[in-house]
Amino acid sequence: MNQGKIITVSGPLVVASGMQEANIQDICRVGHLGLVGEIIEMRRDQASIQVYEETSGIGPGEPVVTTGCPLSVELGPGLISEMFDGIQRPLDRFQKATDSDFLIRGVAIPSLDRKAKWAFIPKLSVGQEVVAGDILGTVQETAVIEHRIMVPYKVSGTLVAIHAGDFTVTDTVYEIKQEDGSIYQGSLMQTWPVRQSRPVAQKLIPVEPLVTGQRVIDTFFPVTKGGAAAVPGPFGAGKTVVQHQIAKFANVDIVIYVGCGERGNEMTDVLNEFPELIDPNTGQSIMERTVLIANTSNMPVAAREASIYTGITIAEYFRDMGYSVAIMADSTSRWAEALREMSGRLQEMPGDEGYPAYLGSRIAEYYERAGRVRTLGSQEREGTITAIGAVSPPGGDISEPVTQNTLRIVKVFWGLDAPLAQRRHFPAINWLTSYSLYQDDVGSYIDRKQQSNWSNKVTRAMAILQREASLEEIVRLVGLDSLSEQDRLTMAVARQIREDYLQQNAFDSVDTFTSFPKQEAMLTNILTFNEEASKALSLGAYFNEIMEGTAQVRDRIARSKFIPEENLEQIKGFTQKVTKEIHHVLAKGGI
C-alpha cells in the first residue's frame, strides 16, 4: 500500500505525488472521502488518477491511498437480474444502504450480496483431478440460469473437499490441493480485472445465426453468435429501440445491457418493460437472463470508460460456463467521448476530431473480446459472446472517427437512415447501405439445417429492392406510367417487401417479434406473387388486371405480419391463393 497526496485536481483527473511504489491500473482511494480512482499514467513519483466519482470539494494536500489491485469485478451468483453502475456498484442495494436516490460519494458496497445464501450442488467428488475452468458444481440462480461454479484460472490439482448446501458467496465451498502442496480454498465467487480478457482454450469460427426476431436483420443482414455488429445512426433514427428489441428477443442464454452515457429515461424504460416481457425461447421473464449496467449521461464521465469493460468481463464469465451471451453497448460514442475528455486533460497529442490517437486500438480491444470459443477445462464446452454496439455520430456523419474505427473491426453494419425514420419506416435500417459479412455463412447454415432454399430467396428479394432503387430516378423524372409492365411489377413487389415485410412495429404485441419459420413463409408469399405475376405478364396479361385481380390476397399477405405464430399454416396457405388468383386472372382473359 502506497500513500501520496493530491497536488492537482482537474475535473475527473487528479494528480498525486509521492506515488513511486504505485503501478499503472492500480485502484486508489482519493481524498478524505475515499473516492474510487484508477491510475492511468505515471511520471516519476506523480500519478495521474482517473476518478470514477464526482471530484468537487476535493483539494490539494488530501491523501491518496493505493490498494495495489487493478479495477476488478466480482463474479458469482447474484449477477443476473441485478443493475450495476459502471464500476459494478449495485444500484438497488446502494439506494437502500444510503437512503438516497443519488450516488453518495465514497460509499463502498460489495458488488455481490454477502448475506444472500445460494444452494450449491456439487458435480465432482473428493479425489478427482481438476484444472482451471472445470465445473465443480451448480447454483440455480434464476428459473432460467444455472450458475456453474468453475475452478479459477491458474488453479489446478486434487479436489480434497467439496460441500453441498446453502452458502454465501464468501463461504469456503471447496478445497484443492495444488501441485506445490498448498491448499486453495475456494468460494462461490471469484474476481477478475476488467481490462484483461479471460483466457480460452481455442477461438472458433462463428457460424450459427443469432435470431433477433427483426425481419430486416435476420433476412438481409444477419449476425452470428460470436459475431460483432455496429448500429450507427443519427439522433432519433431508432438505435436504442433496435438494441432493446435484440436484448428482448435474441435467442441467446444471457443478455448484458450497458447503458453508457445515454439518457436515464432509456434505462428506466428497460426496467419498466423487461420484467413484464416473456422470453419466447424460455417462457420466463426476460429479466431472469439479463444483467444491466447503467452509466447514464448525468453520472461521472470517467465511469463510462469503465462500464464497457465491466460489461464485457461479466459476459466472458458467463461465456466460460458454456452459455451464449449478447452484450449491447449503447452507446460506444459516449464511451469514446469519455476517452477524449481524459486524453485532453492529460494533455496528450490529439488525433482526428480531438479523439486520442489510440482510439482505434481501444475499440478493437473491446470488439475482439467477442467471439465463439472453446473454454478452458477438461470438460468440452463452447461459449459465445455477440457484441452489438450503437454508435451516435454527430449529425449522422458516419465518416467520423468512432464510426470508421468501429467499421474496420465489426463484420455487420446496420446503417440507420434519417429519411427512413422521418417516413416512419422502422426499423430504419437502410437496405442499400447496410451489409453483413456473415450473410453467406448464415445462408449456407440455414439451407443445410432447414433443408430449404433460403439464401436464394434472400438474394432474389434484395435484387428486387436494388432494381427499385435504380428505377426511382426514372419514376421521379417521367412518372410511373412510363415504365414497362415488368418494371411496374418490380416497383409494386419492392413496395410490398418494404412495407409488408421490412417494416416492423416494435410496440405491437405480435409484430414485435417474428420467428424464423414465419419470416420464411412471409417472404415466400411475396416472392411467389412476383414470380407468378411475372409469368402472367410474359403470357400477355396486363399489369393493372393482375393488381386488381390479386388485391384481396395481397391485402392478406400485408396483414400476415399481425397473424400470431401459432397460425403459421394460415400464412403458408397464402402461397397457393396467390397462384390461384393469378391463374384466375389469366383464365378470365386478362389478355
UniProtKB/Swiss-Prot annotation:
Q: Which parts of the sequence bind ATP? A: 233-240
Single Gene Ontology BP term? proton motive force-driven plasma membrane ATP synthesis
A GO molecular function annotation here is:
proton-transporting ATPase activity, rotational mechanism
**Enzyme class (EC, first level):** translocase
Q: Which UniProt keywords apply?
A: ATP synthesis, ATP-binding, Hydrogen ion transport, Ion transport, Nucleotide-binding, Translocase, Transport
Keyword Transport assigned = yes
Q: Which PROSITE patterns match?
A: ATPASE_ALPHA_BETA (PS00152)
Q: Which InterPro entries match?
A: ATP-synt_VA_C, ATP-synth_a_Xtn, ATP_synth_asu-like_sf, ATPase_a/bsu_AS, ATPase_F1/V1/A1_a/bsu_N, ATPase_F1/V1/A1_a/bsu_N_sf, ATPase_F1/V1/A1_a/bsu_nucl-bd, ATPase_F1/V1_b/a_C
Similarity-based family: Belongs to the ATPase alpha/beta chains family.
Stated name of the protein: V-type ATP synthase alpha chain
